[in-house]
Amino acid sequence: MIPIILYGKENETSVDKALRRACDSLRKINKGKEFCIFQYDECDIEDFKNSKGIFVFKGSLGFKRDVIIPKGFIAVVSANNHSAASILRKIDVFAITCGTSPKDTMSISSLDYLSVVVSLQRIIRNIDGEVIEPQDFIVHLKEETAIYPLLTALTVFVLCNKDQNENIISF
């Protein structure tokens, strides 16, 4: 099981919905793998201390308390989320930024109504430590999705997907 922990306002559901669609696609490609989404304030972080996983910062953080990100987790954050960036500066966790700037790790290359090209701008390692080279991903959307939830969901997809040749994705 790969845990995905969401940190932010519970009523902000756009990231949750996009992640659920991405996880459904991942289950079809990576048969036998399970992906579980948890809300930070509803789970015990100690349960994940020996796990690999993904920690996603939502656009609005809401509650203020010390954030603990398990050691084997990769953080995913919007480049515009200054509160999350402040949290990440205080702890030693690898983070992938998502946004519309060429400085971001995952960035929009082109966009139309239900199709998006997203560029991975630099080398990253997936959840198993395997190298993923810079490349473009074509995403066919089943419904309109805002930019940050889309980038977050695609980043989780790329980090968890075993088939690194899979660069045309639907969710």
What are these regions (language model features)?
Residues 1-76, 83-94:
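Phosphate-binding loop of NTP-binding sites
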Residues 100-171:
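Adenine nucleotide phosphate-binding catalytic loops in nucleotide-utilizing enzymes
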Residues 78-82, 86-103, 108-115:
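Conserved catalytic-core segment of NTP-binding enzymes
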Residues 55-57, 74-77, 94-97, 114-118, ...:
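Short, low-complexity, polar/charged sequence segments that are solvent-exposed and flexible
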